């Protein structure tokens, strides 16, 4: 049965699973309805501007402080916080898809860190990961104190059971889990694989539209936030926390997903990438890829993001006398790309769904030789329909440091550079 959601981005939501569970006219009454506890979850400073402020009030069966002391957790062996301090290769890197696990593995233990920059101490930068799992989280829950988490499924459906309600997620949808929200990941199919980004910086939001106007790109109405849902379950559970890069576990005697009602702005949400209103040129030239931005995390430098999440969706190319694929590029920003389905229009082969590529600051990249030759002679008087595709990009202002396990991975394509070596010399000084 399909879940119900609240619609809109950044709304001050209010929802209750039992009638009258939300206090009226105040946040913390002397006694809450149904004998619940009031607890505030703050995602920004108390004094953050109203437009930036993220906080929610939760009305729950037990407050979040009810747990035994945390101890170090030895699991999540491939989820790393150390991106290294040594030299970073300027080479273009590409990986084949992460294999699905051969032994029982849930989401937390199935995360593999591929790179990142910054960290939670400075509240800036990103962690970039792949995940592969074949079982649901059983008897345990997780929260991330370090970062907001962006999930991009490539294979298999997920149910995110969170303190604030349920989110069902499938490939071509994304979800964002704010800092501190407790949850478990359930697999709705036998196997799951995808991408995970930790945003250590300012919370994600849709980009400003500027001269595009009041509509376009990811429209606010298409973001969906869960309605209140709870479980009142006692037993032996564990709560896993990610805190300053380390993993910790605390025993619980109850499920922490016991929020009966809540209101506020700090909440998980999902978005269907198929609703993205793609903007493009209807005259000439391929515009900058910033027009494909779904979500952005601003930095302290205006116009320069801590992170941009952009997609390259199905679209119609109508530009005339134009090289239509993405052009050759060297960028001050660093670009990590993934592919959810289909084929990326700048790479004829080698970039498979579930795979990834990394083009760091000023490392040249662009269409492969086959794509260039075909696009250079294509008939641009006719529109070209790109249908079977959904690529995405995590673009950051800082160099992305690939982890040792990513560089040592069997999925690293050592011959990636070869896709450009057949680009021919066409220069003829006698012919303009």
Curated annotation (Swiss-Prot):
Pathways per UniProt? Amino-acid degradation; L-phenylalanine degradation; acetoacetate and fumarate from L-phenylalanine: step 4/6
SUPFAM superfamilies the UniProt entry points to: RmlC-like cupins
InterPro entries, from UniProt? HgmA_C, HgmA_N, Homogentis_dOase, Homogentis_dOase_bac, RmlC-like_jellyroll, RmlC_Cupin_sf
UniProt: homogentisate binding residues: 344, 365
The main enzyme category here is: oxidoreductase
Question: Could you name the Gene Ontology cellular component terms for this entry?
Answer: cytoplasm
**Which transformation does this protein catalyse, written as a reaction?**
homogentisate + O2 = 4-maleylacetoacetate + H(+)
The domain of life is: Bacteria
Tell me which PANTHER family the record gives: HOMOGENTISATE 1,2-DIOXYGENASE
How is this protein named in the record? Homogentisate 1,2-dioxygenase
The scientific name of the source species is Bordetella avium (strain 197N)
Phylogenetic lineage: Bacteria, Pseudomonadati, Pseudomonadota, Betaproteobacteria, Burkholderiales
């Amino acid at each position: 049965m399909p879940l119900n959601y609240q619609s809109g981005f950044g709304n001050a939501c209010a929802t209750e699973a039992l009638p009258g569970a939300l206090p009226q006219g105040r946040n913390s009454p002397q006694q809450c309805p149904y004998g619940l506890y009031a607890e505030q979850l703050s995602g920004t400073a108390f004094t953050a501007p109203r437009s930036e402020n993220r906080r929610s009030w939760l009305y729950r069966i037990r407050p979040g402080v009810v747990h035994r002391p945390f101890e170090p957790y030895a699991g999540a062996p491939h989820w790393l916080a150390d991106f290294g301090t040594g030299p970073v290769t300027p080479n273009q890197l590409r990986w084949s898809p992460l294999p699905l696990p051969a032994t029982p593995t849930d989401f937390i233990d199935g995360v593999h860190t591929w790179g990142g920059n910054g960290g939670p101490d400075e509240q800036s930068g990103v962690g970039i990961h792949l995940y592969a799992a074949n079982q649901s989280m059983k008897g345990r829950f997780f929260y991330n104190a370090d970062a907001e988490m962006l999930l991009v499924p490539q294979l298999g459906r997920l149910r995110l059971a969170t303190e604030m309600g349920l989110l069902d997620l499938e490939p071509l949808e994304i979800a964002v889990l704010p800092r501190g929200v407790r949850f478990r990941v359930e697999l709705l199919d036998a196997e799951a694989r995808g991408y995970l980004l930790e945003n250590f910086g300012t919370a994600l939001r849709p980009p400003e539209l500027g001269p595009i106007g009041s509509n376009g790109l990811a429209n606010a109405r298409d973001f969906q936030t869960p309605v209140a849902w709870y479980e009142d379950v006692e037993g032996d559970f564990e709560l896993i926390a990610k805190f300053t890069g380390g993993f910790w576990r605390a025993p619980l005697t109850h499920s922490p997903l016991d929020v009966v009602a809540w209101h506020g702005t700090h909440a998980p949400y999902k978005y269907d990438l198929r609703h993205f209103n793609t903007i493009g040129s209807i005259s000439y030239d391929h515009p900058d890829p910033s027009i494909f931005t779904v979500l952005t995390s601003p930095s302290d430098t205006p116009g320069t993001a801590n992170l941009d999440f952009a997609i390259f969706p199905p679209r119609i190319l109508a530009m005339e006398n134009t090289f239509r694929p993405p052009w050759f590029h060297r960028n001050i920003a660093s670009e990590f790309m993934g592919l959810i389905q289909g084929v990326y229009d700048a790479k004829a082969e080698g970039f498979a769904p579930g795979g990834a590529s990394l083009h760091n600051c000023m490392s040249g990249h662009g269409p492969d030789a086959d794509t260039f030759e075909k696009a250079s002679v294509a008939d641009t008087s006719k529109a070209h329909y790109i249908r079977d595709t959904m690529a995405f990009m995590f673009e950051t202002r800082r160099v992305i440091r690939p982890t040792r396990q990513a560089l040592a991975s069997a999925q690293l394509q050592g011959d990636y550079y070869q896709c450009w070596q057949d680009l021919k010399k066409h220069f003829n000084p006698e012919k303009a």
